[in-house]
Amino acid sequence: MINDAHCHFFSPQFFGALARQQLAMRAAPSAMVAASASEIYRELQWDDPVAADTLADRWIAELDRHGVNRSVLIASVPGDESSVGEAVARHPSRFVGFFMLDPSVTDAIERARRAIDELHLRGICLFPAMHHVALSDQRVRRIVEVAAERPGVIVFVHCGVLSVGVRRKLGLPSHFDLRLGNPIEVANLALAFPQVPFIIPHFGAGLLREALIAADGCANIHLDTSSSNSWTRYTPGLTLDAVFNTALAVVGPSRLLFGTDSSFFPRGWQKGIYDTQKQIVEDAGVSAADAARLFGGNFDRLFPAS
């Protein structure tokens, strides 16, 4: 059984947000958003998502084609909770909804409550480097309190290297403060809220050592394996095999979550990432039971099917 703990839902609203940023850079009228979004599809050579329900159905067909049982869908811009909420409502047994939240906006708490209570989303995604809000900030603590009050809700924290490929391709500025994405700061939150599961994606995205230290000290911190993990190039000689072996030794198979970081069509679900990681796990001599946990069981434990 395969469950994917990290897929992005690039909805029409996601592309609309990019279009508005492009138009602002050009000092162009905001009324041109639809035309600008169409231009983005052509420039990237990506498919038009058409509508949230259409995109949700396409993802189901794609998961079925690859034998994937369930998947996380991440609303990839703040304010796009409704798109993922629509996908989850349409396919509740297949999708688990996450949403990106900017702690600096005045209605962050209300947005979080609505996303969880009304739209039935189950993961709050924090990007401290992107939104320039430290994890030690009281605004973040209040957001985690929302999760703590709602059993079954997790907090996902992007740490380490943050490079948004679509922004780079479109020439959009990415003023990220990478100093704020330290997994050790996640440990402080995890210790304060032991009932809340935390997920650090991409093995810490270049901060593997810190991610392992944080997870070793906090039983409620999980690591996801998603993406090609190209951050390994920052450490001479480091291989993805070594990353898996070290994470398995320190964190164990019960707190690793397989993910691909799939996002757009026509590329669809990234089977190559699954194939690579499956081979690494087999080569490491991981038992069938532990491999089943990593590739699906841990997901179902964190997100029991409703």
Feature locations, PLM:
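Short beta-strand segments
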Residues: D4, V72-A75, I199-P201, D224, ...
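Mid-to-C-terminal alpha-helical segments outside catalytic/metal-binding sites
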Residues: M1-A5, P12-R65, R70, R114, ...
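Conserved, mostly hydrophobic/aromatic
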Residues: H6, L63, V84, A115, ...
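Active-site environment of divalent metal-dependent phosphoester hydrolases
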Residues: F10-P12, P78-D80, S104-D107, V161-G165, ...
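A general structural detector for well-ordered alpha-helical segments in enzyme core domains, enriched
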Residues: R58-E62, S83-A87, R111-A115, R139-I143, ...
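Active-site gating/metal-coordination segments in enzymes
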Residues: N69-R70, S76-R168, L172-D177
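Short, surface-exposed connector motifs at secondary-structure boundaries
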Residues: R65-R70, P92-F95, L191-F198
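Catalytic pocket-lining loop regions of alpha/beta-barrel enzymes
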Residues: R122-G123, S136-L257
